[in-house]
Amino acid sequence: MEELLSPKELSRLLKVSKPWPYIMVKRGLLPCYKMGKVIRFKRCDVEEFLERSRVERRG
């Protein structure tokens, strides 16, 4: 089974604010898994999100 991250772990890993994971889920940009009131993120989904969000540098 793949590693699941809590919103707190994800925000620490990516060095973003604590609400950021919830905002991305609400916008439909980051998939999550709900187990009752608890949400978790698959590491591979986070990596795919980061690849899609990548900005190519021009210059």
Please name every model-derived segment:
Residues 44-59:
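A short, Lys/Arg-enriched interface patch at domain edges and termini
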Residues 2-3, 27, 38:
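Helix-turn-helix/winged-helix DNA-binding modules
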Residues 27-33:
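Short, solvent-exposed alpha-helical "recognition" segments
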Residues 26-27, 51:
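Residue-level detection of the helix-turn-helix DNA-binding "recognition helix"
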Residues 33-39:
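Short Lys/Arg-enriched helix C-cap and helix-to-coil transition segments
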Residues 1-20:
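Polyanion-binding surface elements
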